[in-house]
């Protein structure tokens, strides 16, 4: 009966994936219970009184990072609906590329939407399906939606996990004692002491019923197309992706980057925290000194995934501070994991020069990002991307 507490711990481990809001829905065998808040998990779900409002042996949770729909309490997941076959709660990571088209069709046929999130489209399609059994309703829905997604759904009898046919967004399975856990990353399993079993496969539906894990694969087999940004930025460094820690991929990128040019500089400096593994790889390969020329304030959220450009711009100075005595009159190689809009990088370079750096050579660990991402990363237009407008 501590499902909600374990869910809160898992959400805490996944806080890096979204900071706009968080929510948990639990089921006690008879009733569903829901608590949603704007802000961080630790600000709301560490309180025992809040967790007491979420009884039951089943629960799902979600951290919001908006790609569709405004930042507001009504858009915080998991969503809940009472269907004629029983209750349904849904948490969704990703983005549906045909959500607006489906939404307009549903509205024309009498559906009433309470949110602006594409996740509600999934709920409405399941509710509208004329199939009798829940899994059939879900499959009916999945054949209508397009995009990159991982879903966790909870009904009166089942806990269900779904990954899109191309495996764009991640989903893993773990086990704790006799209970199964679905999560976006393995770090959420680690924090509760669960054993990592495997990743959910492309186009696979996994479900737990009567304490047994079962699987169906309704889609034709597709070539795997995982989001490269999971490897580069999103996933926590200690999370496993394809059997390796994200940290290893990032460090290897830094090592390969160092092989491209032989720069003369005093120090290799990472943009913390996401640039640290690549900078370590770069320093190791180039045999240069690694220094923390920037110190991060860990009480400020991740700049890239803040919802507006104005907040992103302010967030850089709130988040990072140069170590002046280290970098003064020094030549630096500044390593970051990626360059999207260029907002953060421009301000960091300016900050380093103002702190006394003699030279700043910027090196980016991942290839140029020239095209929008419509599958769950907030890069909706080409004009926003620095590399696309050089």
Describe each region flagged by the PLM:
Residues 1-201, 207-265, 271, 359:
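Conserved short alpha-helical segments that host acidic/polar catalytic motifs at enzyme active sites
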Residues 2, 67-68, 98, 168-169, ...:
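Flexible loop/turn segments at secondary-structure boundaries
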Residues 22-25, 292-297, 360-366:
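A generic structural motif
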Residues 111, 131-132, 260-266, 284-291, ...:
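Secondary-structure transition/capping motifs at alpha-helix termini
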Residues 121-133, 272, 284-302:
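Amphipathic alpha-helical
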Residues 142, 157-158, 193-199, 218-220, ...:
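PRPP-dependent phosphoribosyltransferase catalytic core
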Residues 268, 275-282, 286, 290, ...:
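Extended, hydrophobic alpha-helical segments in both membrane/secreted and soluble proteins
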Residues 287-333, 343, 370-380:
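Short, glycine/charge-rich flexible loops or terminal/linker lids adjacent to PRPP-binding catalytic cores
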């Amino acid at each position: 009966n501590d499902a909600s507490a374990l869910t809160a711990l898992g959400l805490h481990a996944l806080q890096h994936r979204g900071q706009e809001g968080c929510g948990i829905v639990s089921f006690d065998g008879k009733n569903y219970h829901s608590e949603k808040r704007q802000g961080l998990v630790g600000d709301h779900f560490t309180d025992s009184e809040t967790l007491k409002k979420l009884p039951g042996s089943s629960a799902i949770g979600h951290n919001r990072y908006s790609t569709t729909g405004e930042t507001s309490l009504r858009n915080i997941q998991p969503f809940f609906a009472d269907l004629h076959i029983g209750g349904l709660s849904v948490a969704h990571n990703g983005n549906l590329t045909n959500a607006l088209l489906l939404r307009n069709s549903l509205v024309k046929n009498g559906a009433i939407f309470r949110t602006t999130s594409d996740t509600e489209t999934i709920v409405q399609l399941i509710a509208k399906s004329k199939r009798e059994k829940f899994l059939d309703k879900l499959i009916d829905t999945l054949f209508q939606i397009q995009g990159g997604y991982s879903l966790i759904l909870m009904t009166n009898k089942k806990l269900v996990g779904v990954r899109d046919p191309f495996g764009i967004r991640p989903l893993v399975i773990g086990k704790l004692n006799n209970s199964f856990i679905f999560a976006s990353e393995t770090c959420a399993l680690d924090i509760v002491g669960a054993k990592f079993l495997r990743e959910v496969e492309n186009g696979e539906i996994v479900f737990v019923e009567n304490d047994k894990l079962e699987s169906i694969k309704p889609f034709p087999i597709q070539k795997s197309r995982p989001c490269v940004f999971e490897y580069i930025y999103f996933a926590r460094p200690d999370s496993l992706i394809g059997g390796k820690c994200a940290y290893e991929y990032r460090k290897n990128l830094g090592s390969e980057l160092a092989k491209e040019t032989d720069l003369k500089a005093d120090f290799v400096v990472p943009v913390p925290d996401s640039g640290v593994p690549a900078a370590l790889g770069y320093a190791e390969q180039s045999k240069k000194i690694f220094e923390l020329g920037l110190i991060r304030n860990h009480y400020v959220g991740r700049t890239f995934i803040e919802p507006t450009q104005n907040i992103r711009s302010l967030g850089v100075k709130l988040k990072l501070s140069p170590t002046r005595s280290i970098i003064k009159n020094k030549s630096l190689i500044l390593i970051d994991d990626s360059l999207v809009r260029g907002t953060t990088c421009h301000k960091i370079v300016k900050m380093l020069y103002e702190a006394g750096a003699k030279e700043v050579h910027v090196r980016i660990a991942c290839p140029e990002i020239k095209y929008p991402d419509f599958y769950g990363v907030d890069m909706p237009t080409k004009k926003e991307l620095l590399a696309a407008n050089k």
